[in-house]
From Swiss-Prot:
It comes from Endomicrobium trichonymphae. PANTHER family: CHLOROPLAST 50S RIBOSOMAL PROTEIN L22-RELATED, LARGE RIBOSOMAL SUBUNIT PROTEIN UL22M. Keywords: Ribonucleoprotein, Ribosomal protein, RNA-binding, rRNA-binding. Belongs to the universal ribosomal protein uL22 family. InterPro entries: Ribosomal_uL22, Ribosomal_uL22_bac/chlpt-type, Ribosomal_uL22_bac/org-type, Ribosomal_uL22_sf. This is Large ribosomal subunit protein uL22. Coiled coil: none annotated.
Length: 115
């Protein structure tokens, strides 16, 4: 059984979120929550929140045994464009990026690792 959770329009850059997701792919949920608890990155809080939502969607609220992170990816959301004053009266663009984060968890017993 698979369960999915998504967070959309979150104000983090995709590159920073993807660094955290690389640490949790294809790992058990118990181990993943432990990693995210001690990770000194601000995006770890977001990823942990979405992961807990995915496990709750799987029907396991406190018992994470037997669940594994099958897929975790980040997509680009809309970019908020702002302007900063530059030299000689010019303006310089600032891109405030957003992300769409998706995590899919599945039972470890039914999970088949791709080779």
């Amino acid at each position: 059984m698979e369960a999915k959770a998504t967070a959309k329009f979150v104000r983090y850059t995709p590159r920073k979120v993807n660094q955290v997701l690389a640490l949790i792919r294809n790992k058990k949920v118990e181990k993943t929550l432990e990693i995210l608890s001690f990770l000194p990155k601000s995006t770890a809080v977001l990823v942990k929140k979405v992961l807990k939502s995915a496990t709750a969607n799987a029907g396991k609220f406190e018992d994470y045994s037997g669940l594994k992170v099958k897929e975790a990816w980040v997509g680009n959301g809309p970019i908020l464009k702002r302007i900063r004053a530059g030299s000689k009266g010019r303006s310089m663009p600032i891109k405030k990026r957003t992300v769409h984060l998706t995590i899919i968890v599945t039972d470890a017993s039914t999970y088949l690792r791709k080779k």
